[in-house]
C-alpha cells in the first residue's frame, strides 16, 4: 500500500492501490480466525485490529522500529504477520505524487529508489547530520565540568566533544581549531600547568569560578556590567562629567545671549556691592543678583542723567563755539545745515530714523518738562554723535 500527501500535507491511504499479495494474506487471516471461532463455539465478531499482526520492522524510519501495541495479535493466535498500515509520516510530497513505499516483504516496489535522508538506521545517524545548538565555549565548559577534578587537557576536551556529539566526528580539523581559539581568547578559561609528579603532555584547562554562572544549561551568557556598581572608573567619570555640567548650568546667562561687552566703567556703576555679593543657592537669587546687559546699560544711562548737571556748562559752551546743529534728517542721510540756528528734530523724525525712541532719551528732549532748555545742546549732541559723526571733530 502506498501513501500520498494532499495539498495541506495530510496523509491518507489509497484503498485502490493495495497490492494483491497483501489483500490475499488479509483474506486468509480472516478465514482462519473465523474457523477458529466457529470450532470453539464463539460467534465471529467481524474484522478487528487484533486479527492483524504487527508490521515488519523496517529500517526506513528512525524512532519507529518498535511495533505498535495496538496492532499486535493476541498471544497464541498464530495469525500470520502481514503489513497492514505503513507509518503515517512516510512518503509525503507536495505535488501528490508517490515518493516511496515501504520495503516490506510483500511490497511490489521493495527494490525501488528511496531518498537518501530517509535511509537512517537510528537517531544517532540523524544526529550526525544535525549540528548541536551549543557554542564552542559552551562545549568546552561542559567538558570541563564533567571532569572529576574540573580540569582537562586539550586532547581530553576533543575526546569529550567527539564522544558526546556525533556531528563532530566527521570533520575534526575545523571545530578543533575553533576550540583552541575559544580557549585562548575567552577569559573564563584558565591554563593550569601540570604538576611535577604528573606525567603527560600539555597543560590543563579549568573554568573560572566567577564564570560558572554564565553557562546556563549549556548556553554561554556573558555577564553585563551593572550601572549601579559603585567605585568603578566608568561611574566616576560619569559623575565628574555630570558635576561639570551642573556647574555650567549654575553660571548666569545674559538676557541677550551675548557677553556684556558694553558695560559702563566701574565709577559709573550705581551698585558695586551687587557684583561682590555671593551667589545664592536658589535660581531666584542667581537671577536677582546678576543683572543683565540691558539693565546695566540702563543704570549707566541713569547715572549719566544724574550727573549731567555738572557737564552742562562746559558742553553748552563748547557746542556753542563749534556751532553744531541737528541738520536735516531724511532718508537715513545727514546734510549739514549752513545756518547757525539750532534746530531741534521733531519726535516723528527721530522715530523714522532711529526707530522707537528708548526711555533714556526722554529726559533729554526739550519737551520733557522744565529741564528741556537746560539739556537742549546736550540732547542734540548725543543724537548726532551716536548716529552721524563729522570728520575732524573731537569730543
UniProtKB/Swiss-Prot annotation:
Name recorded for this polypeptide: Forkhead box protein I3
Pfam families cross-referenced by the UniProt entry: Forkhead (PF00250)
Predominant location category: nucleus
Domain of life: Eukaryota
Keywords: Developmental protein, DNA-binding, Nucleus, Transcription, Transcription regulation
Biased composition regions of type Polar residues, renumbered to the chain: 325-335
SMART domains: FH (SM00339)
Example of a GO biological process term: regulation of transcription by RNA polymerase II
Chain's role: Transcription factor required for pharyngeal arch development, which is involved in otic placode development.
Location of the region described as Disordered in the Swiss-Prot/TrEMBL record: 216-288, 322-370
Protein source organism: Gallus gallus
GO cellular component, as recorded: nucleus
InterPro entries, per database record: Fork_head_dom, FOX_domain-containing, TF_fork_head_CS_1, TF_fork_head_CS_2, WH-like_DNA-bd_sf, WH_DNA-bd_sf
Expression tissues: Initially expressed in the pre-placodal ectoderm surrounding the neural plate, which will give rise to all craniofacial sensory organs. Expression then becomes restricted to a region immediately anterior to the first pair of somites that will give rise to the otic and epibranchial placodes, before becoming down-regulated from this region and restricted to the ectoderm and endoderm of the pharyngeal arches.
Low complexity composition bias: residue spans: 234-245, 336-349
Localisation per UniProt entry: Nucleus
DNA-binding region ranges: 131-225
Molecular function GO terms recorded: DNA-binding transcription factor activity, RNA polymerase II-specific; RNA polymerase II cis-regulatory region sequence-specific DNA binding
PANTHER family, sorted: FORKHEAD BOX PROTEIN, FORKHEAD BOX PROTEIN I3
Keyword Lipid metabolism: no
Motif extent (Nuclear localization signal): 221-227
Amino acid at each position: 500500500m502506498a501513501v500520498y500527501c494532499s495539498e495541506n500535507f495530510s496523509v491518507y491511504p489509497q484503498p485502490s492501490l493495495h497490492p494483491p499479495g497483501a489483500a490475499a494474506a488479509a483474506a486468509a487471516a480472516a478465514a482462519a480466525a473465523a474457523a477458529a471461532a466457529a470450532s470453539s463455539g464463539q460467534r465471529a465478531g467481524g474484522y478487528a485490529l487484533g486479527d492483524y499482526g504487527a508490521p515488519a520492522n523496517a529500517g526506513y524510519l528512525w524512532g519507529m522500529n518498535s511495533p505498535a501495541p495496538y496492532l499486535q495479535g493476541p498471544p497464541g493466535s498464530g495469525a500470520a504477520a502481514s503489513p497492514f498500515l505503513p507509518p503515517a509520516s512516510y512518503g509525503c510530497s507536495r505535488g501528490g505524487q508517490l515518493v516511496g513505499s515501504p520495503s516490506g516483504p510483500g511490497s511490489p516496489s521493495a527494490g525501488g529508489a528511496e531518498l537518501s535522508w530517509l535511509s537512517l538506521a537510528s537517531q544517532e545517524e540523524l544526529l550526525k547530520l544535525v549540528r548541536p545548538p551549543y557554542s564552542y565555549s559552551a562545549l568546552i565548559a561542559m567538558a570541563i565540568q564533567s571532569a572529576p577534578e574540573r580540569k582537562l587537557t586539550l586532547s581530553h576536551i576533543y575526546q569529550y566533544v567527539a564522544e558526546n556529539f556525533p556531528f563532530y566526528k566527521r570533520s575534526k580539523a575545523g571545530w578543533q581549531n575553533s576550540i583552541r581559539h575559544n580557549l585562548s581568547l575567552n577569559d573564563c578559561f584558565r591554563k593550569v600547568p601540570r604538576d611535577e609528579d604528573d606525567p603527560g603532555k600539555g597543560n590543563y584547562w579549568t573554568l573560572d569560578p566567577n564564570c560558572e554562572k554564565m553557562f546556563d544549561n549549556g548556553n554561554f551568557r556573558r555577564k553585563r556590567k551593572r550601572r549601579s556598581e559603585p567605585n568603578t572608573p566608568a561611574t566616576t567619570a560619569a559623575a565628574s562629567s555630570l558635576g561639570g555640567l551642573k556647574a555650567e548650568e549654575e553660571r548666569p546667562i545674559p538676557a541677550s545671549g551675548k557677553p556684556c561687552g558694553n558695560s559702563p566703567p566701574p565709577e559709573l556703576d550705581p551698585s558695586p556691592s551687587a557684583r561682590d555679593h555671593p551667589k545664592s543657592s536658589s535660581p531666584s537669587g542667581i537671577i536677582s543678583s546678576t543683572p543683565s546687559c540691558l539693565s546695566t546699560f540702563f543704570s549707566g544711562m541713569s547715572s549719566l542723567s544724574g550727573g549731567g548737571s555738572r557737564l552742562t556748562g562746559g558742553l553748552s559752551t563748547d557746542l556753542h563755539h563749534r556751532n553744531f546743529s541737528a541738520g536735516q534728517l531724511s532718508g537715513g542721510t545727514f546734510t549739514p545745515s549752513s545756518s547757525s540756528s539750532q534746530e531741534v528734530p521733531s519726535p516723528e523724525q527721530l522715530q523714522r530714523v532711529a526707530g522707537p525712541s528708548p526711555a533714556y532719551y526722554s529726559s533729554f528732549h526739550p519737551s520733557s518738562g522744565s529741564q528741556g532748555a537746560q539739556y537742549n545742546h546736550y540732547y542734540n549732541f548725543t543724537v548726532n554723535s551716536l548716529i552721524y559723526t563729522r570728520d575732524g571733530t573731537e569730543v
